[in-house]
Amino acid sequence: MKLRRIDHIGVVVADLPAHVAQLEAMGLVLERVGDNSESNALYYPCGDASVELIEVRDPVIAARRMSEEEQARIEHIAFEVDDLGEVRDLLESRGVEVSWPPFPSGSAMMIWTTAATSGGVQYQFLVRPGGEGGGA
């Protein structure tokens, strides 16, 4: 399994405008907006990776992803890889639960680990178009 690079770090936030202001005050510039039925996601590139700010719309889902006391929390680290099947096989051989089959998000295909089986950290693995395969 080869990790090509860190693609992004996902940060769940309670107050999206406040966190946007913080990133923009540091000189980061909004690259793209992701929007789905559950959340808004704003991507701010920094070098080869991005910071993804995630605002969850549904209060019940938001409570599962972040406690009421938190203003923000790093939710996941995303890695770009060449082959999702290879990642799944390796991680499952080591006892890590992985979502399968891969599912699309924008132009990428992705899988996720279950934090309880991956040392308390949730990891996302994705293949972007033009990658060397999807393993699906």
Regions found by a protein language model. Name each.
Residues 49, 72, 76, 83:
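Extracellular/lumenal glycan-associated surfaces
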